[in-house]
From Swiss-Prot:
This is Probable Rho-type GTPase-activating protein 3. It comes from Schizosaccharomyces pombe (strain 972 / ATCC 24843). One of its GO terms (biological process) is small GTPase-mediated signal transduction. Residues 17-81, 76-135 form the LIM zinc-binding domain. The record marks 816 as: Arginine finger. A zinc finger (Phorbol-ester/DAG-type) spans 697-744. Its main location: other. InterPro entries: C1-like_sf, PE/DAG-bd, Rho-type_GAP, Rho_GTPase_activation_prot, RhoGAP_dom, Znf_LIM. Keywords: GTPase activation, LIM domain, Metal-binding, Repeat, Zinc, Zinc-finger. Interacts with dil1.
Amino acid sequence: MIFRKSISKSPSSKGSTVCFRCGQAFQRRETPISFGGHMWHKDCFCCTKCDKGLEHSDQMLVQTSDGRPVCSSCAHTCTACRMRIKDYALMSGYDSYHRECFRCHDCRKQIIDSNFKRDNRTIFCNDCKQVRHPSRSSDESADYHNFEVDVTIKPTETKSSVESNKSLSIEIMSPQKPPLSPFGGSRDRLVSETPTNMSQAEGGNVPNDGQDSNLASNSADSLLPSAKNRSFSSFTSFESPMKYDDSFFPISPSISPLQKVNKQQQIESPTATFPLSKNTWKNRFHTFHKQSFTPVNDSSSSDSLKPTINEEALDDFAGSASPYKTMSLTDRAEPIVMNGHMRSLHNATSPFRPFSPSYRSSDTHSPRTRSPNVQTHKKTSSQPSDLSSFAQLLSPPQVLSPKPNGGGHKSFRHSHSLSETSQQTLVPSLGSNGEYHLPTNDHSSTPAQSERDSDVEELREQLENLTALTKKLSERLSSSTFDNSKFIRTEDKDTVRSAKLEICEKFFSFADVTDDPTLKDPKHQDLVAAANAYMAMLRESYGTEINNLLERRNELLDDYNNVQKILNESLEASVHLNTKNLELADLNNNLVKQIQHRVPPENQSNLEHTITTSSKNTTSSINPLTAVSSNSGQSSGRPGPLSPNLNVTTRIDIKGKKGSMHLQPRDVNRKVPFKSMHTKSKSADPVVGNEDRTQCDHVFHVNAIFKPSRCYICSESVWGSELRCFHCSISCHSRCLKRLFAESEHEKTMSETVSENSKWMPEMPTRMPPPGPSPTMFGRSLENQLKIEGSVLPQVIAMCVSCVDAHGLEVEGIYRISGSASQVRVLVDEFENGSIRMEHLTSDLFACTSVLKTYLHRLPEPVIPGTQYEELLEAEKIEKEEEKIERVVEVMKTLHPAHLSVFRFLIAHLGRVCKHAEKNLMNSKNVSTVFAPTLMRDKVNRFDLQHATKKSTALQFMLDNVDKILHNL
């Protein structure tokens, strides 16, 4: 069966779509497969390397640079080791390699960079390539790696027309490897025969087997000789043909072991006839193994040539790209089975599919492939063509040159060169016998010269374009009327400025406008005058409104400033009032203590008739939290911790020092009204009237206290969930309840004497006095605290100040906003117990500052005692600032060392707080208002607003000059 198909009129030229592989048009109801920008038959859509049928829905397909599909198995399989590639792959052409498998064929050295050489599909490093194939002269390269191909060219006659031109039709016969004979053994002889008459193949139509019998075997028009003139072609790339059994045996080239395949692998390819036109497929990257040219006779035409091409032969030029079935040139050089007088191929289907080789440079190769455009070979042209198109079709590895011997046909040498960079142009010449002959190849022109010539042509074109562009710019510059002489000195700014002004004057020139006759028209002038009058009216009306709005805005700004001042004053007043409230509370406590201690011992008998004992049995010690039966028969309970569900019943014998506690359930009626025995007293503090002093069985229960009240034991404010007596409604802290039953504390709460000279005092209710100074940290003098701790600063001051320095300098309202009372009590207890941690202080900065102020407030002697305080008030009368600073320093140096160290530490810390007043809003005035009452006290502990203002002023002066004071201290 002869695989010859004429596509002189390509289906694409008729407007139909053809398959990218077989070149055949699609049937009417056939659905093509679109992939890689091309259309495919379902049967033709196969892997380029392994020829395995593919599904278009497969998402793992890989597309080559020319749009051919490759299955995932071939794309991810190493060509060298045949193992699957799981990570990155190095691509060279259509071959994939592991990183460690990408090695030189000779030295087995791993190739890391992209500089390597490639011969066919064999990889060489640069060193091995130079050693293996050193550069040769032009004379040596002419005789190096050649084989003979019988070529005879004659013009053919076709139908003439007005636009007809002479063209040349060349038939290229590709020898392929037929299947082995049944008896085994391969025949390496290549015999090429062509029919003697091709007149019946008009339009490229190939006769069938029946038509072959009508062909004359020895016609005068035969292009190829008969059997006696058969020529043999050696397809070796590196060796010359050698004789074997009276014939030439093609010696296999030195190929990679990966390219060696079994002789059983067969490959077949159809023949093809190519038109030599200017638009014909010009691909310099395909390789031909043998070319034979056959004229096509057409008796109906004598003026023009009709180009024909066998498209199916195009797919066979590059051989197979399968990594598993790689064919060498020698393996393909098998004899062709003769069918009559026409060369025919076996009917077996080729298991291989052609591929488009990658673009390769003669110097370096890159693993990234790039294939040229191979779509133009399907186009036909009726324009005159020459052999230069066919010369471009013959890739650089195979250059045709005429054989010096003569004969009925021309024999050419086919030189297979390793370099793939040169491309020879062949121009046909018409001989005396009417035959076309290829010109002799000039061995003096090397591939490098051809490349240089092409580069020179490109550079000439670029030079012409640049010359034209320069000329165009020169014309534009000469046509410009702008005077650029002023810009000769670019550094002269005055010149540039004057040039700009000149341009603006020219641009805004109204000389031509004034000469316009339209402006002199009376109607136009009236319209302009009316428009100007209207604009003036608008300016006047809107100007008045704008002025009113501006005045309103200024008034609002003034109001805003006034509100800001009032707000600042209110903040200062609130801080001052809070300080005054603390001072008033201290003054109230002091007054109560003074009144209670003024009762003389000799008048103790006068007080006995008002105080009666609640029990005749006295004991020297008191057992707190003892379950005793109540005389009233309410309830009794076991001793245990105080809880909201239990009431604590306490009987107190003030004189007999006896007390008892009863636990009662909460179902006791708590709606007994609180009755104050002093009707004029506005205080909510619990009092004990003269009538009820005889006996009170205190029954404490947990109650929510929201009205201002004082603790019965410590006289401090009570708020929130605390204890309240069910009978007399006195309040008590839960922490102070244990002091009620301590004997030492019980003795301190009893008054033994009453002053004789107290008749002039107003009648006040009698209350239990608060306990004396606590022997704990809060309430201990600085001298004793430093001796106990053995440090320069008390622990409370050091930790609180460090916490504020680290986290609170930019907190708004620091030291002004008080912390939660419950959190403050928790922190105070932790300081007392020694379990305080810095993390506890940083969790609530306001509670931390409140603890510091509480510690300073409870000091028996303030940081600045009364003596130094009086001297500071005298220093405030000094007008000169320097003298005042010196006086303040002198007064501070008279402090006790413990007080002086605390003062230096605190005044430096408060100075740092004032420096961040923009963010924390605590300037020197606000800070002095908060800390002056706690740092300074007079001797008599008097309270008035005048002294409070003097304290704040003195401390503010020290804060404003803190650096100078600390430098001199």
